[in-house]
Regions:
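Glycine-rich phosphate-binding segment of PLP-dependent enzymes
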Residues: 1-23, 32-44
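Acidic, glycine-rich active-site loops and adjacent beta-strand->loop/helix elements
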Residues: 15, 25-26, 50-51, 74-78, ...
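Hydrophobic beta-strand scaffold residues
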Residues: 20, 118, 176-177
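PLP-dependent aspartate aminotransferase-fold enzymes
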Residues: 30-147, 152-153, 157
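Short, function-defining helix-loop hinge/capping sites that tune catalysis or transport
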Residues: 132, 187-188
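Catalytic PLP-binding core of fold-type I/II PLP enzymes
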Residues: 139-187
Length: 188
Protein backbone atom coordinates (compact mmCIF):
# COMPACT_ATOMS: atom_id res chain seq x y z
CA UNK A 1 0.00 0.00 0.00
CA UNK A 2 2.80 2.41 0.94
CA UNK A 3 4.67 1.92 -2.34
CA UNK A 4 1.46 2.32 -4.33
CA UNK A 5 0.63 5.60 -2.55
CA UNK A 6 4.14 6.94 -3.19
CA UNK A 7 3.93 5.95 -6.88
CA UNK A 8 0.52 7.63 -7.23
CA UNK A 9 1.85 10.78 -5.57
CA UNK A 10 4.88 10.87 -7.84
CA UNK A 11 2.67 10.43 -10.91
CA UNK A 12 0.39 13.26 -9.75
CA UNK A 13 3.37 15.59 -9.46
CA UNK A 14 4.27 15.02 -13.10
CA UNK A 15 7.16 17.10 -14.33
CA UNK A 16 7.37 19.46 -11.37
CA UNK A 17 10.78 20.03 -9.86
CA UNK A 18 11.54 18.06 -6.67
CA UNK A 19 11.29 21.23 -4.56
CA UNK A 20 7.93 23.00 -4.75
CA UNK A 21 7.41 26.04 -2.54
CA UNK A 22 4.12 27.89 -2.70
CA UNK A 23 0.88 27.13 -4.51
CA UNK A 24 2.35 26.33 -7.91
CA UNK A 25 0.29 23.32 -8.85
CA UNK A 26 -3.41 22.44 -8.43
CA UNK A 27 -2.52 19.33 -6.40
CA UNK A 28 -1.07 21.60 -3.70
CA UNK A 29 -4.46 23.29 -3.35
CA UNK A 30 -6.03 19.84 -3.02
CA UNK A 31 -3.59 18.89 -0.25
CA UNK A 32 -4.21 22.22 1.53
CA UNK A 33 -7.95 21.61 1.37
CA UNK A 34 -7.58 18.12 2.83
CA UNK A 35 -5.25 19.29 5.61
CA UNK A 36 -7.43 22.21 6.69
CA UNK A 37 -10.53 20.00 6.65
CA UNK A 38 -8.91 17.16 8.60
CA UNK A 39 -7.08 19.36 11.11
CA UNK A 40 -9.74 22.02 11.58
CA UNK A 41 -7.04 24.67 11.16
CA UNK A 42 -7.49 27.87 9.18
CA UNK A 43 -3.89 27.91 7.98
CA UNK A 44 -1.33 25.28 7.05
CA UNK A 45 2.33 25.81 6.25
CA UNK A 46 4.75 23.45 4.57
CA UNK A 47 8.34 22.96 5.70
CA UNK A 48 11.26 20.98 4.36
CA UNK A 49 11.86 19.15 7.65
CA UNK A 50 10.51 18.65 11.15
CA UNK A 51 13.36 20.80 12.45
CA UNK A 52 12.17 23.71 10.30
CA UNK A 53 8.59 23.21 11.44
CA UNK A 54 9.64 23.36 15.10
CA UNK A 55 11.83 26.40 14.49
CA UNK A 56 8.84 28.16 12.92
CA UNK A 57 6.44 27.09 15.70
CA UNK A 58 8.84 28.29 18.42
CA UNK A 59 9.48 31.57 16.64
CA UNK A 60 5.73 32.19 16.25
CA UNK A 61 5.10 31.32 19.90
CA UNK A 62 7.84 33.65 21.14
CA UNK A 63 6.60 36.47 18.91
CA UNK A 64 2.91 36.09 19.76
CA UNK A 65 3.36 35.40 23.46
CA UNK A 66 6.11 38.01 23.88
CA UNK A 67 8.06 35.65 26.14
CA UNK A 68 11.59 34.23 25.70
CA UNK A 69 11.58 30.67 27.10
CA UNK A 70 10.55 27.31 25.73
CA UNK A 71 10.13 24.11 27.72
CA UNK A 72 10.96 20.65 26.47
CA UNK A 73 11.09 17.30 28.21
CA UNK A 74 14.06 15.06 28.86
CA UNK A 75 14.53 12.38 26.21
CA UNK A 76 12.36 14.08 23.59
CA UNK A 77 13.76 14.94 20.19
CA UNK A 78 12.72 18.17 18.47
CA UNK A 79 15.20 18.34 15.61
CA UNK A 80 18.77 19.39 14.88
CA UNK A 81 18.33 23.04 15.75
CA UNK A 82 20.67 23.95 18.61
CA UNK A 83 17.85 25.79 20.39
CA UNK A 84 16.37 22.41 21.29
CA UNK A 85 19.57 20.36 21.53
CA UNK A 86 20.49 20.81 25.18
CA UNK A 87 22.57 17.70 25.67
CA UNK A 88 26.18 16.64 25.28
CA UNK A 89 27.84 17.98 22.15
CA UNK A 90 25.95 21.25 21.97
CA UNK A 91 28.50 23.96 22.61
CA UNK A 92 25.81 26.58 22.97
CA UNK A 93 24.60 27.19 26.49
CA UNK A 94 20.89 27.27 25.91
CA UNK A 95 19.59 30.02 28.17
CA UNK A 96 16.19 30.25 26.51
CA UNK A 97 15.13 26.62 26.95
CA UNK A 98 14.21 24.62 30.04
CA UNK A 99 14.51 20.82 29.95
CA UNK A 100 12.18 19.20 32.47
CA UNK A 101 11.12 15.67 33.43
CA UNK A 102 8.14 14.10 31.70
CA UNK A 103 5.19 13.16 33.92
CA UNK A 104 6.56 15.03 36.92
CA UNK A 105 4.43 17.20 39.21
CA UNK A 106 7.59 19.26 39.80
CA UNK A 107 7.72 20.05 36.08
CA UNK A 108 4.14 21.33 36.19
CA UNK A 109 5.05 23.43 39.24
CA UNK A 110 8.08 24.86 37.42
CA UNK A 111 5.97 25.78 34.39
CA UNK A 112 3.40 27.46 36.64
CA UNK A 113 6.10 29.36 38.56
CA UNK A 114 7.82 30.62 35.40
CA UNK A 115 4.69 31.16 33.30
CA UNK A 116 5.47 34.84 32.76
CA UNK A 117 8.68 33.81 30.92
CA UNK A 118 7.50 30.72 29.01
CA UNK A 119 6.24 31.17 25.46
CA UNK A 120 5.77 27.51 24.58
CA UNK A 121 5.98 23.95 25.81
CA UNK A 122 7.20 21.34 23.31
CA UNK A 123 5.99 17.81 23.89
CA UNK A 124 6.25 14.56 21.94
CA UNK A 125 2.96 12.74 22.54
CA UNK A 126 4.39 9.32 21.63
CA UNK A 127 7.26 9.62 24.11
CA UNK A 128 5.07 8.15 26.86
CA UNK A 129 4.48 5.00 24.84
CA UNK A 130 8.18 4.15 24.97
CA UNK A 131 9.48 5.59 28.25
CA UNK A 132 13.26 5.78 28.39
CA UNK A 133 13.56 4.81 24.73
CA UNK A 134 13.69 6.76 21.50
CA UNK A 135 10.44 6.93 19.55
CA UNK A 136 9.89 4.16 17.00
CA UNK A 137 11.21 4.65 13.47
CA UNK A 138 9.09 4.75 10.30
CA UNK A 139 9.69 1.10 9.41
CA UNK A 140 8.52 0.00 12.85
CA UNK A 141 5.44 2.20 12.66
CA UNK A 142 4.51 0.81 9.23
CA UNK A 143 4.39 -2.68 10.77
CA UNK A 144 0.84 -3.54 11.78
CA UNK A 145 2.18 -5.46 14.78
CA UNK A 146 3.82 -2.45 16.45
CA UNK A 147 4.30 -2.95 20.17
CA UNK A 148 5.24 -0.34 22.70
CA UNK A 149 7.27 -0.83 25.83
CA UNK A 150 4.47 0.79 27.82
CA UNK A 151 1.66 -1.18 29.37
CA UNK A 152 -1.89 0.18 29.32
CA UNK A 153 -1.53 1.68 32.80
CA UNK A 154 1.54 3.67 31.71
CA UNK A 155 -0.21 4.82 28.54
CA UNK A 156 -3.22 5.93 30.61
CA UNK A 157 -0.96 7.83 33.04
CA UNK A 158 0.72 9.56 30.11
CA UNK A 159 -2.65 10.51 28.63
CA UNK A 160 -3.63 12.08 31.98
CA UNK A 161 -0.25 13.86 32.12
CA UNK A 162 -0.84 15.35 28.65
CA UNK A 163 -4.31 16.52 29.71
CA UNK A 164 -2.85 18.15 32.83
CA UNK A 165 -0.14 19.80 30.74
CA UNK A 166 -2.72 21.08 28.27
CA UNK A 167 -4.92 22.49 31.05
CA UNK A 168 -1.92 24.21 32.66
CA UNK A 169 -0.73 25.72 29.37
CA UNK A 170 -4.25 26.97 28.62
CA UNK A 171 -4.58 28.48 32.10
CA UNK A 172 -1.14 30.14 31.93
CA UNK A 173 -1.52 31.31 28.31
CA UNK A 174 1.43 29.25 27.11
CA UNK A 175 1.46 27.74 23.61
CA UNK A 176 1.47 23.94 23.73
CA UNK A 177 3.25 22.50 20.70
CA UNK A 178 2.67 18.82 19.98
CA UNK A 179 5.73 17.77 17.99
CA UNK A 180 4.45 14.64 16.31
CA UNK A 181 5.81 13.19 13.11
CA UNK A 182 5.63 9.46 13.79
CA UNK A 183 1.93 8.74 13.31
CA UNK A 184 1.87 9.56 9.61
CA UNK A 185 0.18 12.96 9.67
CA UNK A 186 3.54 14.74 9.81
CA UNK A 187 2.35 17.89 11.59
CA UNK A 188 4.50 19.75 14.08
Amino acid sequence: VYKRCVAEGMAAMGDLSPVVLGPLHPCIFDVLGHLTRISGLDEVSFHMSGTEAIMCAVRLARFNMRKPLIVQFQGAYHGWWDGVQTGVGNERQVADSLTLLDMSPRSLACIRARRSEIAAVLVSPLQGLNPGSPPPNDVTLMDSKVRTTADQATADKYRVWLQQLQALCTECKIALIFDEVYTGFRMA
